[in-house]
Swiss-Prot record:
NCBIfam families: clpP, PRK00277.1, PRK12553.1. GO terms for cellular component: cytoplasm; endopeptidase Clp complex. It is found in: Cytoplasm. Fourteen ClpP subunits assemble into 2 heptameric rings which stack back to back to give a disk-like structure with a central cavity, resembling the structure of eukaryotic proteasomes. This is ATP-dependent Clp protease proteolytic subunit.
């Protein structure tokens, strides 16, 4: 089990201990920092809903360092980002690959960022199945449906033509922040928090 740092704060009632992610949540920061899978997605969704309930008019900041993962888990996070009332600023720290890149570009328009040396990668969904031929065919058709859905979402958020998205996602497509900005996945490349704060206003 990986170690999670504990932060100690002094309050009027004495010391209060938080794990580092809970402390970041107090600042309305959600950290997507691992493979996207069901348990992690449920935690992210819960945090988004909590921050909306706490203050529906105050922005949420989602920091992303993820290699991607399960499509349905990623779509649960994505849909919740679109569902809640607060604006969601996204920031790539390290990498935003596969479903991580969809979450990055699914942030509020004008509030999608990357640090200077991050990497962004898009590609088509993959899947491996075994069993009866009919079941394999059903799963293959479902994968194609998901591929079309993801292409449409990237097209919506990047402003790129659907045909260009389809071509760009045929293979692993790695981008620098500059290339991701040109593609429409992010809006700005930032090197300090002050720049992020000013550009969000």
């Amino acid at each position: 089990m990986s170690y999670v740092p504990i932060v100690i704060e002094q309050t009027s009632r004495g010391e209060r201990a938080y794990d580092i992610y809970s402390r970041l949540l107090k600042e309305r920061i959600i950290f997507v920092c691992s493979t996207v899978e069901d348990h992690m997605a449920n935690l992210i969704v819960a945090q988004l809903l909590f921050l909306e309930a706490e203050n529906p008019k105050k922005d949420v900041y989602m920091y992303i360092n993820s290699p991607g993962g399960v499509v349905t888990a990623g779509l649960a996070i994505y849909d919740t980002m679109q569902y809640i009332k607060p604006k969601v600023a996204t920031l790539c720290i390290g990498q935003a690959c596969s479903m991580g890149s969809l979450l990055l570009c699914g942030g509020t328009q004008g509030m999608r960022y990357s640090l200077p040396h991050s990497r962004i990668m898009i590609h088509q969904p993959s899947g491996g199945y075994k069993g009866q031929a009919t079941d394999i065919e059903i799963h293959a058709q479902e994968t194609l449906k998901i591929k079309r859905l993801l292409n449409e979402l990237y097209s919506k958020h990047t402003g790129q033509e659907l045909k260009h998205i389809e071509k760009s996602m045929e293979r692993d497509n790695f981008m620098s922040p500059e290339e991701a900005k040109k593609f429409g996945i992010i809006d700005n490349i930032i090197s300090s928090r002050d720049v992020m704060t000013m550009s969000a206003k």
